[in-house]
UniProtKB/Swiss-Prot annotation:
Gene3D superfamilies: Pheromone/general odorant binding protein domain (1.10.238.20). GO terms for molecular function: pheromone binding. Disulfide bonds join 37-77, 73-129, 118-138. It is found in: Secreted. GO terms for cellular component: extracellular space. Keywords: Behavior, Disulfide bond, Pheromone response, Pheromone-binding, Secreted, Signal, Transport. GO terms for biological process: response to pheromone; social behavior. This is Pheromone-binding protein Gp-9. Belongs to the PBP/GOBP family. The gene is Gp-9.
Length: 153
């Protein structure tokens, strides 16, 4: 019995460490064009917000507007290079397809509904950089809420 409890404790510790590690990652850092877009915008990885900071909304209160805009420009650059965005316009269908491929979400999945809501919320924004960061922040926040609600279930 003690061994079983120890295994459960270790599993919980590993799961917590993994979630913490993911939240410390920089937004967009897992994508191919990350370094290219950083260079194109004259930024370093230190300039980019962490996933945890963005999913919790702390990026809005902890940073100046220029930092928000620069992070958004890097996000827009990656979205554009991946064919998901052209200027300030989304390719909504391609964005859904890529999101499903990346997350493994199935039809009816609340994550897809969240993505759709985030695209709808930001679609009329004209500044491509601000629009991109707000979209990414919206999706990350929704994923965090959905993850929390599924853990509590």
């Amino acid at each position: 019995m003690k061994t079983f409890v120890l295994h459960i404790f270790i599993f919980a510790l590993v799961a917590f460490a993994s979630a913490s590690r993911d939240s410390a990652k920089k937004i967009g850092s897992q994508y191919d064009n990350y370094e290219t877009c950083l260079t194109e915008h004259g930024l370093t990885e230190d300039d980019i917000f962490s996933i945890g900071e963005v999913s919790s909304g702390q990026h809005k209160t902890n940073h100046e507007d220029t930092e928000l805009h620069k992070n958004g420009c890097v996000m827009q650059c990656m979205l554009e290079k991946d064919g998901l965005m052209s200027g300030a316009d989304y390719d909504e269908e391609k964005m859904r397809e890529d999101y499903i491929k990346e997350t493994g979400a199935q039809p009816g999945d609340q994550r897809i509904e969240a993505l759709n809501a985030c695209m709808q919320e930001t679609k009329d924004m004209e500044d491509k950089c601000d629009k991109s960061l707000i979209l990414v922040a919206c999706v990350l926040a929704a994923e965090a809420v959905l993850a929390d609600s599924s853990e509590g279930a």
